[in-house]
């Protein structure tokens, strides 16, 4: 029994502490929720909501964005002036200094309010309401915090070459070049090769044959004679194809 009584008491104390902290927070304006309509109460199951403390109904709206995005709209909103006027009149009741941005290809409309409180009121009242036979949905637009109007430079990652930069960063160290891999055995074997000689790479075994490299001989005089003979040879003449005889139809 003691545990059953202590639980609600601790919960009420925690809620009261949170409410006091919210009231003491500087620069924060608190507004209560709009009362639920009869249809909404029926959807929620009905009942008396008087047991809810008014402090629990207060919500911090200071950090909410001042724009909403309307989705699932009828295509007539983007082409028909009368339908567009009806659509805008729904939101002008919450804010007179309101602007609209229509995105026909995305079938969405961005509604810009003068303050976040009007945007929150419109979202609470018009979200999932029927307009022109379709259920309209409202979402808060994402806010962008731009510190500077200039494009920020890219991060200097992986921009340092092996040579030291003009102003090395803290902790930069010179990278040593790797030692090239040289096969001295192969160079020694190639140096011992001569024209007309052969070199045995692998000796034969009982199960494998030997691998022998034969160096091709090069006769410089013979190559020069072949080149001179190729130059003396007459170039073949390309004979063009003869055009077929043409007889006009009116003369045939």
Curated annotation (Swiss-Prot):
- A Pfam family matched by this chain, by name? Calcipressin
Q: Which UniProt keywords apply?
A: Phosphoprotein
PTM entry text: Phosphorylation increases its ability to inhibit calcineurin and decreases protein half-life.
**In which tissues is this gene expressed?**
Highly expressed heart, brain and skeletal muscle. Also expressed in all other tissues.
Induction entry: By calcium.
Q: Does the keyword Phosphoprotein apply?
A: yes
The record's section on InterPro entries has: Calcipressin (IPR006931), Nucleotide-bd_a/b_plait_sf (IPR012677), RBD_domain_sf (IPR035979), RCAN1_RRM (IPR034906)
Q: Which CDD domains match?
A: RRM_RCAN1 (cd12708)
Outcome of substituting residue 163 to E: No loss of phosphorylation and no effect on protein half-life; alone or
Q: Which GO annotations describe the biological process of this protein?
A: calcineurin-NFAT signaling cascade; calcium-mediated signaling; locomotion involved in locomotory behavior; negative regulation of calcineurin-NFAT signaling cascade; negative regulation of smooth muscle cell differentiation; response to estrogen; response to ischemia; response to mechanical stimulus
Where, per the database record, does this protein carry Phosphoserine? Answer: 163, 167, 218
Compositional bias, Acidic residues, is annotated for 219-228
The entry lists its GO molecular-function terms as: calcium-dependent protein serine/threonine phosphatase regulator activity; identical protein binding; nucleic acid binding; protein phosphatase inhibitor activity
Name a single GO cellular component.
cytoplasm
Q: Does the keyword Transcription apply?
A: no
Region entry Disordered, spans? 219-252
For this protein, the record's SUPFAM superfamilies field holds:
RNA-binding domain, RBD
* Family as reported in the entry's similarity comment: Belongs to the RCAN family.
Subunit-level organization: Interacts with RAF1. Interacts with PPP3CA and PPP3R1.
Protein function: Inhibits calcineurin-dependent transcriptional responses by binding to the catalytic domain of calcineurin A. Could play a role during central nervous system development.
Q: What is this protein called?
A: Calcipressin-1
Q: Which organism is it from?
A: Homo sapiens
> What is the gene name?
RCAN1
